[in-house]
Amino acid sequence: MKRFFSVLLFCLGAAISGSELQLSSPRAIKVDDPEDPVQIFAAQELQRHLKMISGIEHPVGETEPATFVIGRKAPSDMERMNTGEGRYTFENNVLYFYGEDYYDRKRSLDKILADRDNRTGTLNSVYTFLDQECGVRWTAPGNDRIVFIPRNSVVLKEKKVNKWRLPLEFAFVRPYFWNPKLIAGNNKRVPEELRFSSSEVYRKRLEHIVWTRRMRLGANEIIRFGHAFTDYQDRFLKTHPEYLGMNQDGSRGLPDQLKNRVKLCVSNEAVVDQIISDWQANGAKKYLNVCPNDGTPGFCRCPRCLALDERRENERFLDHLTDRYVNFWNRIAAKAVKIRPDVTLVTYAYSYYRFAPRREKIQYPENILLGLVPMLMEDNRRIMEEWRKAGVRHFFLRPNDLCYEAVYFRGFERGIWEQFSAARDIGLNGMDFDACIGNPATELDFYIAARAMTKPQMSFEEIEKEYLSIYGSAAPVAKKFYELYRRNGDKMMRKVYRKLKQEKRYLLDSGQIPIVIQEKINFYYPVSLMREASALLEETLQYASELNESERRHLARLKSLNDHSIMTFELVEALNRKAADIEEKRNKLLKYRIQHKDLGFCWPLLFTRPRAEGNLKIR
C-alpha cells in the first residue's frame, strides 16, 4: 500500500551517512543455495516487497554479479552467529542476507515455515531489512495488508553488520484456526456459498503461517512443552491404573472421549520414576516437559494427594491444587538433576494450580521454567511476583487472550499489551499465545501481541500507530473507532468475569466470552456504540475527498466488519427474547455474509463452533 512521506525520506537521507543502493533499475537477487526452499522463499519475499516499494521487478536467479545475495555471509563478517540470529551487511555494492538456520531442507516449504521449532535466521534478515530500512509493516495476514513507503533507493552503511535476534527465547502465536481437517468436517454445515475449497483453505493457512514469519515469531532454542501426558491412559490404565488420578467414586482414569486430558496421581513415586524413565529413553534432553493435562475432570482425590494440598477453611476441592503440583515437580527435578544437572523442567501454572503455592517452595529454581497461563482480568503481575517469592526464576507466559472467535470488536488490545508489559518488567523468557488467527475483528489484537514480543521496547501507542498506518490519512478516524470499542471493552470483560465467578467458573480463555455474552447480548454490548462507530466511518467515507483508493478500501472493509457485527447482534438479541422477526433477521444476516464472503472470517468454523456461533444455530 503506497504511502508518500517525502519529507520523512528527505530527513532520513540527510541524517544518515552511507552508500546509496539504487532500486530504480532491475538488480539481480542471487540464492546462494538453490536447493534450499527457505532461501528461495526469502529471495521471493525480497523480490515481492522491493517491487511494491520501487515499482521495479528485481530478477531472482543464480547469475553473478548480484546486488542481493541470499544465504551467504558477508566477506568481512567473521563473528559467529547466535541461534536464530539474522544479519544483513552491505559490502562493495552487494547486500548480503544471512543467518543461523535450523530446518530440514527436504521438507516442503509450508511444513518448514509451520514448524515453530525451525529457525529461519536468513529469512529473518530479509524481514529485518524490510522493517528497519524500508519501513514495511505487515498489519495482518495477506499481501493486501502490507504497508510500505515508496522509494527508489536505500542508504546503507558500508560493512555495517546489522543484527537481529528474537529478544525472547521463544515468541509464538499459534496459527491453527484455518485447519483443513476442522474446516472439511464443518463445510457442509454452512450455506454452500460460504464454503471453502481445499485450495482456498491451504492458501489462507499459508497466509497466516507466512504472517507469523514476517513478524519474525519463532524460537532461538527448541523448548518443547504442552500437555505432556496425553497418552498415559492408553499406556497405563490396564497395567498401572494407580498412575492415574482417582475420581470421587474411587475409579481411575477418564471416559474415552476425555482420555487425552487424564490427570496423574502426583503423590505416587512410581509416576515420578516413569517420567524419568521415559525421559532417559528419549535421550535425557535438556528440556523435560511435565506440563499437566488441562480440563476439569480427573484431578486425583486419593488420600495421599489430598494430603499434599494446602486447603483453607470453606475452600472447595478445586480452589487451590498448586502445592501438590509443586511437590510433584520438586520430586521429579531431584531425580532428573542427578542424571543431567542442567536439565530444565517445563511446566504450566494453570487453572486450579495457577496461584503460587502456600506451603511448598521451588527447590530447584535454576531447573524450572514455569509457563503461567493467566486468567483474563486478574492481577497477573501480583501472581508472578508471588511465584517469584516461592522460588521461580524463569517464566514464560502462555495466554489464551487471542482465542476470541466472536464477530464483535471487543476493545481489549491495550489489555493484551499491559499483560505483556507486566511480565516483561518482572522478567520473561518467552511467550506463547494460544490463538485463532483468522478473525478480522481481532487483527489489531494480533498485531499488538506479535509486535510487542519482537520489539518489547515499543509502547502501546507506537504499535497501534504502526497498525493504523494501513488507513493512511484516515488513521485518526480508525483510531477513534477502536477507542470507542475500548471504552466498552473493559466493562464488558468485567461483566463476563463477574458472571462466571457467580457460577464458580473462571475466565481462563477468551473463547468463553462469546458463549457468555450471547446469552444476553444487550447486557454486554450497547448497540448504540456499535452504530456510533459505523456512523463515524460512513461520514469519513462520504466526505473525506483526500482518501486514496487503498485507504478508502480498507476503511470500507472496517465499516463492513462493523455493520456485520451489528446485524449479528440484532439477530442474537432477537433470539434472546424469542422475537417474532427472528427469521427476517436471520435471512438478512445470511444474505450479507454471502455478499461479503471475503471479509476474512472462516465461515465453516464461525457457524459451528460453540465458542463462536455454534450454540445459536444461525443457519
Per-segment meaning from a language model:
Residues A74, N293-G298, Y350-P357:
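Short, internal active-site loops enriched in acidic
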Residues S25-I29, A66-T67, N93-L95, E169-V173, ...:
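Hydrophobic beta-strand segments of well-ordered beta-sheets in folded domains
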Residues E45-E57, F129-V136, D278-N282, K335, ...:
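Structured segments of extracytoplasmic/periplasmic soluble domains
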Residues I16-Y88, V147-K160:
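Acidic, contiguous N-terminal accessory segments
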Residues P37, A42-E45, H49, E85-R324, ...:
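Feature activates predominantly on carbohydrate-active enzymes
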